[in-house]
Amino acid sequence: MNSIKLPRTIHIGGKGQVKKLTLGGTSPILLQTMWKESLLGADLLSIVKSLNELEQLGCDIVRFAVPDMDSAEQFVKLTRLTEMPLVADIHFDYKLALRCMDGDTAKIRINPGNIGSKEKTEEVIRKAKDTGTAIRIGVNSGSLPSDLKKKIEEANSKRNLSGDKKALDDEISLLRADTLTEAAARELEIFEKADFKDAVVSMKASNVRETVMANEIFAKKFDNPLHLGVTEAGPLIQGIVKSTIAFYRLLEQNIGSTIRVSLSDSCENEVIAGREILTECGKRQGGIRLISCPRCGRKGFDVQAFVKRWQTKLLSEKKDISIAVMGCVVNGPGEGKHADLGITGAEDSVIIFKHGAITKRLDLKKLTEEEKIKAVDKAFIEELQSL
């Protein structure tokens, strides 16, 4: 059985004021998200502010859709305003990739299923070499080359005529994974002939099983760094579940150099989800680990409201500590005593504790709801800052 290859090391960014990042090898796994809005008419300084906030949450790279030349012009301007390494997501028109590389672009993402002829890809590679820009070959199950699509269509036709659909389903899943790998391999051949070494690869299906199989097959044959993701993963809960299953299975085998949790939700939630997955898989250390109880009828403290109010701020902190937010005195400070800092409540009082020892009690009986929130937040921030 072929073993997983250690991915080659490549560098992205480093132009202008953009941070230089190391990808692959034994480097930490990088966390990405994708900007959710059009660049057309956008306030670029406002985007820079948002990029800074995403960085505080733990984001390393942000990708932007560049569907037309006006968007490419905006993208080039944006690359010169931020330290965040930016990726231009290009489909159909290779000239958009060429224009984006005039900026301080960290990486270009192209899709071999729709970028056009080999000659167009070669022109993109030449400019990438000249400008020191990495390229991601992004293969999606929905946009495979026509001959590979035909293979899958023929297999599906046989399945519809078969009595043993389950057996054929397994074969078709493997075939789909193979076609994703084949599409990537074909494109890589062009890159290798051009002696272009800074190529990252991604192979994504909306099906977890096929995504995992494709990346496993690829990682045994090639040493290009892999970007992991499940395409069209879905809304918040479904998307996180799919991504977590796929990433865990791959990261446990040391497959993957970057990840993105694709969600029909905010960039912030993509980053938070990705960060938590990396932490729980033992692939990222540091930062605040937020623990909270699921709530029940005993609750004396509104865990949900407190977490909603504090989550982004806490996850932006660089302190390497754990914080427990517990709904009642059963869970805190007793079950939360392992935490560096914790908070809970009982009736009209709030308790703040460190390593299970109570450090502060607040009597909220005579306060309005607004005053209660202010008092709790003030006491909590004081204890947090003391750590």
UniProtKB/Swiss-Prot annotation:
Pathway: Isoprenoid biosynthesis; isopentenyl diphosphate biosynthesis via DXP pathway; isopentenyl diphosphate from 1-deoxy-D-xylulose 5-phosphate: step 5/6. Binds 1 [4Fe-4S] cluster. GO terms for molecular function: 4 iron, 4 sulfur cluster binding; 4-hydroxy-3-methylbut-2-en-1-yl diphosphate synthase activity (ferredoxin); 4-hydroxy-3-methylbut-2-enyl-diphosphate synthase activity (flavodoxin); iron ion binding. It comes from the Bacteria. Its cofactor is [4Fe-4S] cluster. Its EC number is 1.17.7.3. Keywords: 4Fe-4S, Iron, Iron-sulfur, Isoprene biosynthesis, Metal-binding, Oxidoreductase. It is an enzyme of class 1 (oxidoreductase). GO terms for biological process: isopentenyl diphosphate biosynthetic process, methylerythritol 4-phosphate pathway; terpenoid biosynthetic process. It catalyses: (2E)-4-hydroxy-3-methylbut-2-enyl diphosphate + oxidized [flavodoxin] + H2O + 2 H(+) = 2-C-methyl-D-erythritol 2,4-cyclic diphosphate + reduced [flavodoxin]. [4Fe-4S] cluster binds at residues 293, 296, 328, 335. Belongs to the IspG family. Converts 2C-methyl-D-erythritol 2,4-cyclodiphosphate (ME-2,4cPP) into 1-hydroxy-2-methyl-2-(E)-butenyl 4-diphosphate. This is 4-hydroxy-3-methylbut-2-en-1-yl diphosphate synthase (flavodoxin). It comes from Treponema denticola (strain ATCC 35405 / DSM 14222 / CIP 103919 / JCM 8153 / KCTC 15104).
